[in-house]
């Protein structure tokens, strides 16, 4: 997505706000497709791949893949937002936000890490991001970039989450019936996860 920055900047310079927003929605949908698919893979396939490569003793509790997938997804879904924030010249909004995110991340990591271990440290990143740029940067580009209500973005974001959870529910239901070796499980789950994600999204 970083490679698209120049093209998006040129598009913004030559097109109307409506056309700009249409392109933003398209890129946001591509974000959801790619990172939603990847998040499902992390949740449902990573354990079998770890077992295959390193042994079952290195497979972590399902909470770890879940929170890793959540981190992966939330960062990925910000790609289009950050691209448009840069190309629309909205730098001055939230210029100190990254500092706040870092401070919150450290504070939450210490607090949650002591109580929940590595799960708490990974969870801290989501909390820190959720309190800062996860909502603020979309607000900036919707309000100051496209002159639209931020609710437009939020509704689509929540709808994408619903679709992702439905796909995850289907995967979780089907995968409980898959047996065999770690190699067989990995191959079958990767194929099914890809089919379900691409079919649902």
Residue ranges and their predicted role:
Residues 10, 51-52, 87, 113-114, ...:
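Transmembrane helix-loop junction
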Residues 7, 15-22, 140-158:
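Interhelical loop/hinge segments that connect adjacent transmembrane helices in multipass membrane
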Residues 1-28, 82-87:
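Helix-loop junctions and terminal segments of transmembrane helices
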Residues 1-2, 44, 63-113, 118-144, ...:
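Short runs within selected transmembrane alpha-helices of multi-pass transporters and secretion channels
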Residues 21-75, 106-114, 164-169, 173:
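Alpha-helical transmembrane segments of multi-pass membrane transport and lipid-handling proteins
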Residues 101-104, 115, 154-201:
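Transmembrane alpha-helical segments of multi-pass transport proteins
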